[in-house]
């Protein structure tokens, strides 16, 4: 009997232990969600929204802070623990500063990607550990009953929750590192030219451009709810609080304050004044009360106000989004597909990708000379232009983009460098002047062959010319020689250097005088 009772007792203890462990009843499981601090009553829940929705247009109710210059080696966050007095109340908390927010700050969905879509809730530790957060706090508001993420949430460039234009305080970082605080229209949230890479919604804009902005924020976020008293109580009650903002150096600032609603902690006015003393320029209030949680290096470092299932202990609440400070990361992580992430910085591949995210094409100062498009392989020239910077007109005989097409005109005459039209009528340039005098030039390959043929022709003609010149020289010399010989002979005749031979002697006849003398001597009758 005693042994059976003992076995039953052991079984009962084991069963109770299993059930308690399954339900987290030993002080390390789920909280009771008993320290609830809501800006609006549960009945209203702002389903229809008491304030104005803004879908289009650009509001003037936000502040943009340019990204701070990158400093080598200044990547690790600074975490300060404090115990300060507010109206004679000792209040502990943590203040975190993180340089280069674009690369060191992220908004995380509960339990990882897809958490908002599945309306998941998880403790800050559960969300922060897989993401390698050095510092993590709870983020935006959510519905306690359903786990639905409220307001705008952009995590790593992905929009996972929409406020639908509802005007609550926002804090986000755009792709170029600009810090944005305030109220945004739906159009501004959806901007694609410089989109948000991180964004979350809070309630109440605490500090705007170095001044407390709580009164204006109450009027802007919800006028009618002030009449119920719930929103006014949310602002003025002491409780655990969290906030996010930035200082004048462009560093991200996270504030966490321990407390319990109506018993310990601070109100929003006290939190705003404290942040002003820390040189904070813009800041918004995030979820507080039992949601306020601070995790350092993956370990809970705050005192939650929610009770565990066993009232002896306090347990961290399962919340929605988480704000995370981590080691520098490339933004986006894949460097837009055009680079490699090394020590938090994108090393761009190729010769023309530039920018912190390797998302900008840069073909040099000339920018393709306004005659082409910069691509990842260089300038793609418009029709009629060529060269590495698209600064050269097409040579005669070529046309089209990059001057890749030969003209198809007769005799390889020039064509329009843009259209290839053989009726040349482009603006007067050196090329057109050549065309006007009908000088047609073939493509470069034909020109080379023509030059070789021309060289051969010139050589042949030179040889022929030299031969003819030589023959002419010989002929001239011969003619000169003959001429000089004839002239010498003529001179000899003129000088008397000759013998007279009568023609009769040559013919065997006597001259007439001699005949007469011979006749007289033989005639006896001649007197």
From Swiss-Prot:
- Transmembrane segment boundaries: 464-484
Catalytic activity from the UniProt record: N(4)-[6-(N-acetyl-alpha-D-glucosaminyl-1-phospho)-alpha-D-mannosyl-(1->2)-alpha-D-mannosyl-(glycan)]-L-asparaginyl-[protein] + H2O = N(4)-[6-phospho-alpha-D-mannosyl-(1->2)-alpha-D-mannosyl-(glycan)]-L-asparaginyl-[protein] + N-acetyl-D-glucosamine + H(+)
GO molecular function (one)? N-acetylglucosamine-1-phosphodiester alpha-N-acetylglucosaminidase activity
Q: Which residues form the propeptide?
A: 26-49
State if Cell membrane is listed as a keyword.
no
Q: What does this protein do?
A: Catalyzes the second step in the formation of the mannose 6-phosphate targeting signal on lysosomal enzyme oligosaccharides by removing GlcNAc residues from GlcNAc-alpha-P-mannose moieties, which are formed in the first step. Also hydrolyzes UDP-GlcNAc, a sugar donor for Golgi N-acetylglucosaminyltransferases.
Q: Indicate what this protein is called per its UniProt record.
A: N-acetylglucosamine-1-phosphodiester alpha-N-acetylglucosaminidase
Q: How does it sit in the membrane?
A: Single-pass type I membrane protein
**Residues spanned by motif NPF internalization motif:** 523-527
Associated pathway: Protein modification; protein glycosylation
Q: Which residues lie on this side of the membrane: Cytoplasmic?
A: 485-527
> Which Gene Ontology cellular-component terms appear in the entry?
Golgi cisterna membrane
* Transmembrane listed as a keyword: yes
Posttranslational mods = Glycosylated. Contains complex N-linked oligosaccharides with appreciable amounts of sialic acid.
**Chain segments carrying region Mediates the interaction with AP4M1:** 498-505
Q: Where is this motif: Tyrosine-based internalization motif?
A: 500-503
What does the UniProt entry say about where the protein is found? Answer: Golgi apparatus, Golgi stack membrane; Golgi apparatus, trans-Golgi network
InterPro entries per UniProt: EGF-like_dom, NAGPA
Subunit organization: Homotetramer arranged as two disulfide-linked homodimers. Interacts with AP4M1.
Q: Which cysteines are joined by disulfide bonds?
A: 116-149, 133-324, 308-315, 363-374, 381-390
What region holds the EGF-like domain? Answer: 359-391
Per the UniProt annotation, where are the glycans attached?
Answer: 209, 215, 297, 367, 389, 421
What is one GO biological process annotated to this record? secretion of lysosomal enzymes
What Enzyme Commission number(s) appear in the record?
A: 3.1.4.45
For this UniProt record, the keywords arranged alphabetically read as follows: Disulfide bond, EGF-like domain, Glycoprotein, Golgi apparatus, Hydrolase, Membrane, Sialic acid, Signal, Transmembrane, Transmembrane helix, Zymogen
- The protein's organism comes out as Bos taurus (Bovine)
